[in-house]
Amino acid sequence: MAQFYYKRNVNAPYRDRIPLRIVRAESELSPSEKAYLNAVEKGDYASVKKSLEEAEIYFKININCIDPLGRTALLIAIENENLELIELLLSFNVYVGDALLHAIRKEVVGAVELLLNHKKPSGEKQVPPILLDKQFSEFTPDITPIILAAHTNNYEIIKLLVQKGVSVPRPHEVRCNCVECVSSSDVDSLRHSRSRLNIYKALASPSLIALSSEDPFLTAFQLSWELQELSKVENEFKSEYEELSRQCKQFAKDLLDQTRSSRELEIILNYRDDNSLIEEQSGNDLARLKLAIKYRQKEFVAQPNCQQLLASRWYDEFPGWRRRHWAVKMVTCFIIGLLFPVFSVCYLIAPKSPLGLFIRKPFIKFICHTASYLTFLFLLLLASQHIDRSDLNRQGPPPTIVEWMILPWVLGFIWGEIKQMWDGGLQDYIHDWWNLMDFVMNSLYLATISLKIVAFVKYSALNPRESWDMWHPTLVAEALFAIANIFSSLRLISLFTANSHLGPLQISLGRMLLDILKFLFIYCLVLLAFANGLNQLYFYYEETKGLSCKGIRCEKQNNAFSTLFETLQSLFWSIFGLINLYVTNVKAQHEFTDFVGATMFGTYNVISLVVLLNMLIAMMNNSYQLIADHADIEWKFARTKLWMSYFEEGGTLPTPFNVIPSPKSLWYLVKWIWTHLCKKKMRRKPESFGTIGRRAADNLRRHHQYQEVMRNLVKRYVAAMIREAKTEEGLTEENVKELKQDISSFRFEVLGLLRGSKLSTIQSANAASSASSADSDEKSHSEGNGKDKRKNLSLFDLTTLIHPRSAVIASERHNLSNGSALVVQEPPREKQRKVNFVADIKNFGLFHRRSKQNAAEQNANQIFSVSEEITRQQAAGALERNIQLESKGLASRGDRSIPGLNEQCVLVDHRERNTDTLGLQVGKRVCSSFKSEKVVVEDTVPIIPKEKHAQEEDSSIDYDLSPTDTVAHEDYVTTRL
């Protein structure tokens, strides 16, 4: 196993050990770079800015360095959602790379906005190109910002990108064979498939559809249908495409949930987008709902608001129908069903009469059609009883009275199917399985009528039925009529859809039939295989002599496997236990043949009964459970299709009255003949501009109403989506990390505030002492070297003086000192020096000289951190004392290395930070000369109060220091190494 880890070495001292080493080693970070990245991780703004400024001057660190996880400082700031650090890093022009993609994936809206505004788009309004690092990038080249934002479904980020003018590649059709698709698939089929999946995943984003689509419903319908078709082609990504299709369907349903009134619902469901402004269109035909049924948007159709509108139209004449007792409902339906001939005759004579308009209502139309079909089934039952048939031996019997009564219904069914195919088209007609069943049923009735006519014309003599030919027309007609009766009775199942209890069962039955068809393919293969083998084995043992009955249907079964057809029958009926085992025996003493035949027969029964039949049961159970889990949606969708068939204008009269030509039909027929067949065709009267204008205005008004409703729905949907996201978010690991980052940043801010408040108090005390020394010049000359040392003390000898913030505030508010420093009013000259600080500090060593343009941009919107303010106050105090020393001639640069007139110092803090205790500060003073600009680094120690200095001299055990030089300064003593 060791050879998998390292190259085998014979001289290895420990052969029972596996030495490990880093095979793919990366470049190590310097301590400064580690500190820089650590500061970014902790959110230390001052330290990060200091590192960036030093990097611009001394080039000690690489500001684009990468940590072991492959993250730059910018990516770390994005992960921590630290917008201040992101803005700081971008101001120093760090490498952006794919930071925008990382910000989008983390859904940091502020970071995305900063990155989008970092580089202004040039030329077209596009997002600046992202420079992807092929070595470390986590994103493939086809992932663009808008695609990734759509994957995250973040509405705010998508809106920012769309406002920048981004675009998404248009995917080709499912079975596109263009040069681009073929070449891309040949070069790299995986990349081609993944790229198309990423594009469709972006297009299926609900936020993107709601934000960029003029008609979100139509976009969701078409996209879900296209994704469903694509799942059948791209079998490798079938589950992904099906999930995206369900996502689009759910989006359309959720968007419809936001409707608040029947007016909004009617505007949406009646909107038609395939008409121009000047074409006449109906405003109450539920065009959008028909489109949803065409694209099989079950969630949209079964939505409660949509179903409520359909129910109100279905029970138009019976507003309180659902609240009535079930007995009242049954009696009402029975009375209307009995009166359907009266309603039909009234509609034929006067279509606009009250009774004629009454039968046009969808619910009344449904009851009348159901009553008509039940009457047809009753006639079929009478025909099967042969009540009026006496001459059973007549070869060509004439039609009976019942058969004459059945004929109008058959003609009415055929005429209704022809009209349905003409109105809806052949493609829509064959997509409905009930229409295929009607086609088979009507074909059987037509064949029966034709054969009966042939038998009546050709055969008229009486002849015993036993002597008739097997293919006699009457016998074939009777067989076809019996099969047609079965289909007619089963056709009644389609009406179960209207009932909430029987509807789900009817849908489950239809799904189980599909499972049975799938099962039959496998079963037929097994059946044919064993039938071929058994027939080959028993073909030589066929018995023909002395048998009055041959086959398995005899009283004593024989010759079960003599022919292929008999073998197939025997194997099929053996599933139901109707075949005896002795059929595998032969008369000859061939025990081996008997054993092989019995073994084959038993193996077939095991496979067919134990394996295949149980597999069929499992498949049917799965189909039923699938329907049961979505019973409400499946049933409402099927019921809606049934209701919509009765909402149409045509097909008002039930059979057999639909074959009777009405006056309206005769008028339409004469008009059509006059228009198309006569020589003098009717010239269509041209429409006036006023009529066209009014029609265009109505269509435009409908379009504006639809867009207004869509705007309101999208706003409500986005608000509900954001509320739901906030509710379901909860406490996650990301929230804990963000909380830790905020606490860390707040800690450094508090430390900076404490440091800045203390130093500002000391600076005010120094200003007061310098003012008093200027008023009493003679007194200051007489005090000697002790006083000179106190005057020459620099603020850069300080590291940190912890004073309670409340005490400082109290001293400033009441003009009182808390014992640490004097608080006096600042002279006007000192204020003027601070105002002119930028001009005085322009040659200071650690400050980077900016260009005029950058300076102008910074002055336009200056943001100072706490560390910047401390440095500025320190430099101002040092400059003030140096000017005083220069005017009095007291500046000296002796052994103590106190800064001179031509030297400025900045205190570099190297104090070790701890979260629990604030330890002793140890700093370095960095001095820069104005002339030679050389840097001198001297060690400094804290300023120790005078009353504590004596104690510290005695306690040398605590601090092991070398001989020191002590300088007294009022209440404090500075100890120098």
Swiss-Prot record:
Annotated region PDZ-binding domain: where? 975-977
Provide the intramembrane stretches.
325-359
Explain what switches its activity on or off, per the activity regulation comment. May be operated by a phosphatidylinositol second messenger system activated by receptor tyrosine kinases or G-protein coupled receptors. May be activated by intracellular calcium store depletion.
Q: Disulphide bridges in this chain?
A: 549-554
Reactions performed catalytically:
Na(+)(in) = Na(+)(out); Li(+)(in) = Li(+)(out); Cs(+)(in) = Cs(+)(out)
Biological process GO terms, please? calcium ion import; calcium ion transmembrane transport; calcium ion transport; gamma-aminobutyric acid secretion; oligodendrocyte differentiation; positive regulation of store-operated calcium entry; regulation of action potential firing rate; regulation of calcium ion transport
Q: What is this protein called?
A: Short transient receptor potential channel 4
Give the gene symbol.
Trpc4
